Amino acid sequence: MAAVFDDIRLEDIPVDDVDMQDLEETYAVERSIEFDRYVVVDGAPVAPEAKVGALQKVLTKLFSQAGSVVDMDVPVEEGRTKGHLFIEFEDAGAARRAIKMFNGKKLDVKHRLWVNGLDDMERYGRPDFSTEYREPVVPEFEATEYPRSWLQDETGRDQFVLQKGEMTAVFWNRNNLQPENVVEPRRNWSNSILNFSPHGTYLFSFHDQGIASWGGPQFKRLRRFAHPDVKAISMSSTEKYLVTFSSEPLEVSDEPNEACPFGPESRGHQLCIWDVATGVCVKTFALPPQQQLQWPMVKWSFDDKFCARLGPGAIAVYETEKNFQLLGGKVMKIEDVQDFSFAPKGIKLASNRPNDPPSTVMVYWTPESNNQSCKAVLIELPNRRVLRTINLVQVTDVSFHWQNQAEFLCVQVDRHTKSRKTIFTNMEICSLTAREFPFEKVEIKDRCMRFAWEPNSDRFVIISRSENVNDNPAIAKNVVSFYAPEKKVDKKGVIIDKELSIFKKWKLVRAIDGKFSNEITWSPAGRFVCVAAIGKIGSRNENIDFYDMDYPNTEKIINTATDVNATLRDVAHINYASATDYEWDPSGRYLAFWSSAWKHKAENGYKVFNLAGAIVREELITDFNNFFWRPRPDSLLSNSEKKKVRKNLKEWSAHFEEQDAMEADSATRELILKRRNWLDEWSKYREACKQTLSESGLSICDCVELSTKDEDCELVEEIRETVVEESTEEVPFFEE
């Protein structure tokens, strides 16, 4: 009989110091099944057993969009499916993508799929799992300041930002007067540069933890975008989405974390798309290994309905309104595609009906192969209809230049000779509003280095360079060429309105050789263009040239062609040896050049020029880093309203001159304000007198007409005879 010890309990015996490693290794149960690769699908059609194969085929094709499907089990009971099934994917990432893509998706009119992970079933089956609906806690609404408040400035001033060392300041532009602070200067506002959104609504700053957006009259922080170590950002066309890129892949835990904006499916990704208004991450991408990256990596359509990115042998187009799903459920497979570009505006295609919305147009190009020539292809989205294809030969590179209104597209084709020793450029210019999209070829003997369309116009400027000249850097080899459409004349010799002429032929207005210029920048308002030499610090050849393409005095123009829609005049020539960057203000009246300490330490500061090339303001600032204007949204005025403003420009000019005088001199300001007060007092006195007289039945300046208009006038007719010449002549007399 075994001994019994009533005073000894089993739980009191210490076992923590007992080594049971050998027992754990001996009896360890290996988990051979990875349950995170399985998903459970509810809501599937209940079908006869004979149609299970067809059902599996349909669902396999659907779920293959998330990843490779290894197996699909469809339970059958009493000769019919049970309405749910189990799917095994190749890896856990594919299973998570399937849950995200297809949970709640309508399969047809009567069936909606509900997708959950197999691991979730264990959690749902626990006794402590509550099935009671809990209404989510909605955070209280926080009113924000008007993000476009700077547009309400009474004098219509623009804003600009200066960065000096650790300090950043935002100013109102006051022409040649001292700038006025918008907010107090801030220290360490950003780790590096700051960026405005395309229309100036948001200001973005860089930080170790991610990106922050700022806005409103006081530039308060609006949202945070938690993406560590961001290197570059870009914005969508309508400012709805923000794209961030980090060189470090995302590290995401498997455990749910409300503070983390990323799910497990984003692990290892480096590219993120955010909703700017809410701060929510809507899409992430992994980058292809060992591939040269081109920024921006994500490009947007004019209305943000589509975004696309380039991949190996394909272009992936996503529909933003459908949770960033692939257009048509698949990528556009294009063998060896090199680059693509969206039209910056919607295009009214000639083949469409008048009431049809503007079309989204994309262009891409593929290089030459053994059996095919180089091609540039215009397509329409979302139907992927090919609008026009041009075939090219002996091509080295292709680049696209859109006119800002998407009326014209220049396909710049860099071609090589048969010996491949020399490269020259052809420009294929397409008119996108004309039927059948005609292309006009402009041939250049040299290689084009820069190309720039005039805003809202059909003229352009290029900088080219011959590859057959001396390589001595001290010799100016660049050529600046100005192009404009040829004037068209009807049979009677009358010039046809350039707005009515669809088929255009571009001609060289003037070519200016022997230049060091390497940058072209047009005024946003058009007409004026600046050509500059930037980058060679300390060089005497760093010059800035201003040109007017519509100079009114034809005696001073420098055209070599007269039958073109341009009258070219060189306005100013300026030397600024330390300039590193430049930017026009949104109005197109001022052009700022600056010297950044991020690039060199010589004469850091900025200079602002007007259209005539005169300096409006300049400052030398030690440790000066950056200068940039705040952009403006597109004008809301119609063409007729703009014409009305131009018609009354003299009246507006007088008003603006008065405002400028008031800002320039305090004494003048006081005098103008006094005169305004006197005028107001006189107007009030006159109204009071008018009211008093009206009560007596009289009106101001009552008078009795004493005579009619005809009675006041008397017609006097005077006849004068003047003898011009008098002579005497003897006339023979004939009798009858």
UniProtKB/Swiss-Prot annotation:
Give the gene symbol.
PRT1
Q: Where are the WD repeats?
A: 140-182, 186-224, 226-244, 245-284, 288-328, 332-375, 443-483, 511-557, 566-604, 616-662
- Gene3D superfamilies assigned: 3.30.70.330, YVTN repeat-like/Quinoprotein amine dehydrogenase
The name of this protein is Eukaryotic translation initiation factor 3 subunit B
| InterPro entries xrefs | EIF3B, eIF3B_RRM, Nucleotide-bd_a/b_plait_sf, RBD_domain_sf, RRM_dom, TIF_beta_prop-like, WD40/YVTN_repeat-like_dom_sf
Biological process per Gene Ontology, one example term: translational initiation
List, alphabetically, the CDD domains matched: RRM_eIF3B (cd12278)
Region (Sufficient for interaction with PIC8), start-end ranges: 1-219
For this protein, the record's SMART domains field holds: RRM (SM00360)
* Entry annotated with the keyword RNA-binding: yes
Organism for this UniProt entry: Eremothecium gossypii (strain ATCC 10895 / CBS 109.51 / FGSC 9923 / NRRL Y-1056) (Yeast)
What domain of life does the native source organism fall in? Answer: Eukaryota
Question: Where is the protein found, in the record's own terms?
Answer: Cytoplasm
The entry's keywords: Cytoplasm, Initiation factor, Protein biosynthesis, Repeat, RNA-binding, WD repeat
The subunit field of the Swiss-Prot or TrEMBL record says: Component of the eukaryotic translation initiation factor 3 (eIF-3) complex.
